[in-house]
Amino acid sequence: MSKTLVRKNESLDDALRRFKRSVTKAGTLQELRKREHYEKPSVKRKRKSEAARKRKKY
């Protein structure tokens, strides 16, 4: 879980910007979207294979 303490004389917008950056860096939202719905093992394998094929292409 990402935590951000608001510093002295720091605006709320700046603290929110730092929080969003830390959440993005940790990959929290990406993980949440991935786990939002159950993914069958066959679909997971297919997605992984597609990603590998895409990486190999370039």
UniProtKB/Swiss-Prot annotation:
It comes from the Bacteria. Keywords: Ribonucleoprotein, Ribosomal protein. Residues 27-58 are annotated as: Disordered. GO terms for cellular component: ribonucleoprotein complex; ribosome. Pfam families: Ribosomal_S21. GO terms for biological process: translation. InterPro entries: Ribosomal_bS21, Ribosomal_bS21_CS, Ribosomal_bS21_sf. Residues 43-58 have a biased composition (Basic residues). Residues 31-42 have a biased composition (Basic and acidic residues). One of its GO terms (molecular function) is structural constituent of ribosome. Belongs to the bacterial ribosomal protein bS21 family. This is Small ribosomal subunit protein bS21. It comes from Lactococcus lactis subsp. cremoris (strain MG1363). The gene is rpsU.
